Regions:
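Membrane-interface aromatic/basic loop that binds lipid-linked glycans or pyrophosphate carriers
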Residues: 270-335
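Short, flexible coil/linker elements and helix-boundary hinge sites characteristic
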Residues: 26, 61-62, 114, 192-195, ...
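Generic surface-pattern signal
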Residues: 54, 58, 147-149, 168, ...
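Acidic carboxylate-rich catalytic motifs and surrounding loops in phosphoryl-/glycosyl-chemistry enzymes
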Residues: 124-126, 222-224, 263-276
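Catalytic core of nucleotide-sugar-dependent glycosyltransferases
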Residues: 222-225, 236-265, 285
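Non-membrane alpha-helical secondary structure
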Residues: 45, 238-244, 258, 270-274, ...
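Nucleotide-sugar donor-binding/catalytic module of glycosyltransferases
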Residues: 1-241
Length: 335
């Protein structure tokens, strides 16, 4: 009989942090050994990551502990996708090797997975902290230091509507890896539908949206972990901000529309993204990589312009329909 949950850790050249995270997991998982499997996927590290994995495999010999070492560095997103595709349990929870998680999180997750047979997605609320200043960080549209502002712990709401709310409030919230537990069969199906998701840094939003549209969703009110802002893998990539804002987010929105989300919602999200992009990012990229920047931004501008035109036409049609109805009503009252 398959176990309930795979807790997967993708890692690369962070042996010390991995050791600390596995030490946390060894304590947090006590009492749930029969429900869980552990998977560590090493993205071809050159430090002593393998020694750390072997040490903890020997220590945690009462639980299924799988490990993988890629023959080359696949990049962080592909390593995450490997973890998701390799899970054989009903649910998969892929966690960062450096994210601070509360001890009670594992027990909470297991209890919710056991209690809701049709659950397809679980978001653990989290707080944010700036790595340099230590100051609290959270979306400006949300009050208090948390990243989700919807309370949905009974899993009986409209999963699609819950995801739409969360996504519209904060893209960052729905792509925070450690905050998300997916139902394995759904996340694998989503990856089969869009194989190129592994080349999109925002694709975790698509995976969450797909799962949300196909079952129950839980979003916790309390926070169970912390996101340290300023250490993300994509922030180290030179073109990351340009690609994420002008290419990857629009791609995800279009994929959501292809997989059941309304045209109205996706159009609204594209227009919202058009308002929120930082044009300084484009201007900076234009100086450094002119051709690449232009090739990235021109399709984005065309897409947002098309959405804006579509909205204008819809408003004109509604206005015309309203005027026609009013005229008919006036004629009906004529003597």
């Amino acid at each position: 009989m398959p176990k309930l949950l795979t807790i997967a850790i993708p890692t690369y050249n962070r042996a010390e942090l991995l050791n600390k995270q596995l030490a946390w997991l060894a304590q947090a998982i006590k009492g749930f050994e029969d429900d869980c499997e552990i998977l560590v996927s090493d993205n071809c590290s050159t430090d002593n990551t393998q020694e750390v994995i072997q040490k903890w495999q020997a220590t945690l010999n009462n639980i299924t502990f799988k490990s993988n070492k890629n023959s080359k560095n696949l990049g962080v997103v592909k390593n995450i996708m490997y973890c998701l595709n390799s899970a054989t349990t009903k649910y998969v929870w892929t966690i960062g090797d450096d994210d601070p998680i509360q001890d009670r999180a594992v027990a909470y997750v297991i209890s919710k997975l056991r209690g809701h047979e049709d659950l397809s997605l679980l978001f653990l609320n989290f707080s944010g902290r700036n790595q340099i200043t230590g100051e609290a960080v959270h979306p400006p549209t949300i009050v208090g230091n948390r990243w989700f502002d919807i309370d949905s712990e009974d899993a009986d709401g409209d999963g699609k509507a819950i995801f739409e709310h969360c996504f519209s409030k904060s893209v960052g919230a729905v792509i925070f890896l450690t905050a998300t537990v997916y139902r394995t069969d759904l996340v694998k199906r989503a990856l089969q539908i869009w194989p190129d998701a592994e080349n999109n840094w925002i694709s975790l939003a698509y995976l969450a949206g797909y799962c949300a549209a196909n079952g129950g969703v839980i979003v916790t009110k309390e926070t169970y972990l912390e996101c340290v802002v300023g250490v993300s893998y994509w922030q180290k990539e030179p073109k990351s901000a340009l690609l994420m804002q002008y290419k990857h987010i629009p791609e995800v929105i279009l994929k959501l529309q292809e997989n059941g989300y309304s045209k109205q919602f996706c159009r609204r999200m594209l227009l919202q993204n058009g308002k929120e992009v930082n044009w300084k990012v484009f201007l900076g990229a234009l100086r450094r990589w002119p051709m690449s920047a232009i090739k990235t931004v021109v399709p984005f501008v065309a897409l947002v312009s098309l959405c804006a035109f579509d909205v204008m036409v819809s408003k004109e049609l509604k206005l015309a329909e309203s005027s026609e109805i009013s005229s008919q009503e006036m004629r009906s009252y004529e003597p």
